[in-house]
Amino acid sequence: MATVTTPITPLPPAPTSKLNHLSQDEQDALKAAVFQRLHPRAYLEKFLAEDVRPDGRSFDGFRDVSVNVGSISTADGSALVRMGNTTVVCGVKAEIAEPELDKEEEGFLVPNLDLPAMCSPKFKSGPPSEEAQVLSDRLNQALLASNLLPLKTLCIEKGKAVWVLYVDATCINYDGNAFDATLLAMVAALRNTTLPKATYNPEIDQTLCSRKTPRVPLKLSPSLPISMSFGIFDSKFVLADPTSFEEPLLDTTISIILGDSNQIVSVSQFGSTMLTVEEDGQDTRRDALAECIEVAKARRAEVANEIFT
Amino acid sequence: MASHVRLDGRKTTETRPIAISFDKLARADGSARFSFGETTALASFSGPIEVRLASELPSKATFEVHLRPLSGVSAADAKSLSSAIRSSLEPSLFLNKAPRTLAQLVIQSLSPSRGASWGDSLSAAVINASSLAIVNAASIPMRGIVCAVAIGSLSDGTLVLDPTDAETAKLRGTGCFAFMFADDIGEAGTEIDCVWTSWRSIVGGYDEKELLRAKEVARVGARTVYSAIKKSIQGAILGVGTAEQTRDEIMKTDESESSDDDEKMII
């Protein structure tokens, strides 16, 4: 008689057997990486169910920020910002131009963000992608709304000559939340900017800058705008400062820009902020915007202390 | 505050006269024109149609929004607004009902945009026209209707709905809010969900209370827009016959939503 109980057959050797030269830890890491690639949503859900994010942060945790100013000597002002792995470098270049006829005393502030193919495989080389254009426009709106640099302070001679500031930012490593990082880089670069003393000479109809007189810093308003962004995943989880892995999975993004003493400069929300929370076995809905603003206020104070003092 | 009189005699919580017409652009699946007073936008919607291979999505329809200004070519500001429109309309559409296709929305502004950026009331008109065009096409099932209004804050803190160009020059803060209205969902009757907020200060900052106050005023304003939209659909489409379907599809949200959840779990 044949044996009744057959021993449990071992699992067929998985293709991972080719990976035998790797240690057990390395094999596990590889499996996790493959799972993350193939099922990004399920991967994120598994982490969030354990109250943690894939990079080990809590839901309302921001990544570390560091700012380095004045590293580009050829620019009139510059800054390099790291926010986790997201790295943005920003340079300010000043030129002289004629003002517009209806705004004789106002200069120009031209912010631009470039997302080159170098910074992430997500982006293609060639003309600026839609994402870069959208971010540039939002940065422009943020700088205008905060009134960081009153445009009248850029006037050299009314109706004849004004400064144009090209605030060019380039992302050199993209790991999500480029908006916050770039706004920080632009503000830091403008704080670092100095302009030569320029005088308009009506006799030759030209503006002259002197190398001998010391350069003057910009007359910025003391209220520096700082942006804090959040994302909502699956109408349940509010994730602060999303990474490039989390970003495409989010239903909603919120950016809150705060000035000094927690004055709100701008709030933009794309998608619904209603959260579905289970309480006593019942689904209730509540708005996440107010709590985001609270978290943003705490974070603003932290960043401002660390970087702008 | 309530006694504040506006230049054109409106109350602070009143929009300019709303006009809606369905233009029947011959080559689009659906089209509509929406105006707040003089601020007008024309939207056309086609879909589901064939999608370019590069932008095909295996689990849902690709939703494209193209926005054209009255003059010139669309620049970064139009791109930025069209991405905002896409994100505010997307929650209202069941794009997963037509995977591997394209849903294309093209909007033509019929009013000049002020200066460098699109005015908030024009943005609101653009969103409302888009919602109407999608309803008019009746080819993609919807969860609700997205309605938007512009709002401004005067220097004394008074909030005014749908500010005109003359008022915009004097504003301290300005913004646009879009809400999604869905009838017959849950026990509460109409469910209202804010899907787009864009609120900026012009001079100085503002606090949280002002934001919430603005949102409430906007919610009331959006409700008037919603009633106008509902009335126009009942008047202009329900008579035509094919529109029975539109209404059914809007009403069927309960069922579709549950099936949507199922699909989410499978994915």
What are these language model-derived features?
Chain B
Residues 1-267:
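Polyanion-binding surfaces on beta-sheet-dominated domains and ring/shell assemblies
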